[in-house]
Amino acid sequence: VFDHNDDPASVVPLVRGLADHGARTLYIESSRFKAPTDIQYPNALGAALDEAKARGMRVVVWYPPAFDDMERDLRRSRAAIDFTSPKGNRFDAFGADIEYTEGVPDHAQRTAAAIEYSRRLREGAPDAVLASIVIPPTSLEVNPGRWPGFPYAEMAPFYDAFMPMNYWTTRGKDANTANDLTERNVVETKRLTGKPVHIIGGLAEYVDEAQVGAYVNAARRAGSIGGGLYDYASTKRPEVWDELRAFNG
């Protein structure tokens, strides 16, 4: 969930809908590097966290560093990790969404910044559960110029899990593509990092039951610890939710 404002009424119904569909974890963005504040929508964020906890869900908060201002990125990441809701709830984990390339155009400098950010993030939050949301290996196979030498292995010591953005619909909107890319991205990310992998799927607006079924089966077969589609607002078809609930089994 990221497309909301600071009115709790804009996000609480989304959380309720997720819970009603059987989702066990809510993923929600805390802010962006261009936002005016470290927590962009604190009222809505707190309301979403409280609603999710009331419904027995886990909640992961994420922030996308741009690496052009290291202190800002670290400060905003820590603000998300330390955030406490009006009812005293805290997030279960934090996701560093490491994909933005325009903040530091030079590949080598950006890679060094991503590693430094990850190291300092862990140093500042030694007991937090941290995940790295990353460009999937198959994406860099077909577009290596996006981020040459993406530092999967170098970042691995600082994270508990990796979450590749396995958006197979950018390559093909069919079950075979969903199956192939999902399995390859789980296996390759595990090989590169040595860490558990939670494979993200999508884009939800372009998928059907067959694609999602293939995605779920491939993810489970390859050893992913979980999964879900990006994003909730565009996950419209009931039959898609039926397939996604297989992750809960």
Language model features with spans:
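Aromatic-lined carbohydrate-recognition surfaces of secreted/lumenal glycan-active proteins
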Residues: 1-3, 57-70, 114-149, 193-206
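Boundary/entry segment of secreted carbohydrate-active catalytic domains
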Residues: 1-24, 29, 65, 132-134, ...
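Short, acidic/polar
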Residues: 2-20, 70-87, 143-155, 182, ...
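Hydrophobic faces of well-ordered beta-strands that scaffold small-molecule active sites
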Residues: 26-28, 59-63, 94-96, 130-132, ...
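Active-site groove signature of glycoside hydrolases
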Residues: 27-34, 80-111, 228
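Aromatic- and acid-rich polysaccharide-binding/catalytic face
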Residues: 28, 91-104, 147-179, 230-235
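Aromatic-lined substrate-binding rim segments of carbohydrate-active enzymes
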Residues: 28-64, 104-132
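Substrate-binding cleft of secreted/luminal carbohydrate-active enzymes
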Residues: 159-175, 188, 195-249
